[in-house]
Amino acid sequence: MEIFKIPSFEIVNLELLKCVASFQKPIILSTGAATYEEIDKAIEVILGEGNGDLALMACTLSYHTENEDPNLKRIQTLKERYPNFMVGMSDHTMPDENMVIPAISVALGARIIEKHYTMSRTMTGSGHFFSLEPRDVAKMVKNIRLFETVLGDGVQGVAANEVRARKGGRKSIVANSFIKKGTVITKDMLTYKRPGDGISPDRVNELIGKIVQLDIKEDFQIKWEDLNE
């Protein structure tokens, strides 16, 4: 796949952006040290060529970047300000043992991760010392995949793996003491005990005033079929 990657230094080179956009190929634009006004103008120029296939990269223009400086929350800021474009992270921090920063970036919404790469950080040259070595890339990908897995879909509800614990850990309404047939139920006759496979405590008020149709022993669950009006 042919993609143009525009470094942060060129975000104000509007003639370059115009030319690149005219090829109608996807563009990845880094935004390090750029103001919102500069980003807006760059986007305007690119869109002006009819090219909307654009991704914006959060970036700190510092080689290397200290761990306190990436400001990863910018990923969320860019996503909120520019909802029509994919957002990624261009990361210049030093590789750590578990490659945490790229994974956190993904957790915050980054869809693209850019890191410098080298065969060895001992090689001479300005960018090698903070670049990823092959083993680092493997760790980074593994950690990112783990983060993607644990993030889930964000839907709140009862997951399949929670059903057993939900049933066993929650409580049901039971008789606080022996309840004789024909008794009108009052609140003091009831208490809550595990497991949660009976009537849920949040329905206790529905039981008050109902008449017991049979004897219910202490600690036995109250069942709807044992009651009448």
Predicted segment positions?
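Catalytic cores and adjacent flexible loops of soluble metabolic enzymes
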Residues: M1-E229
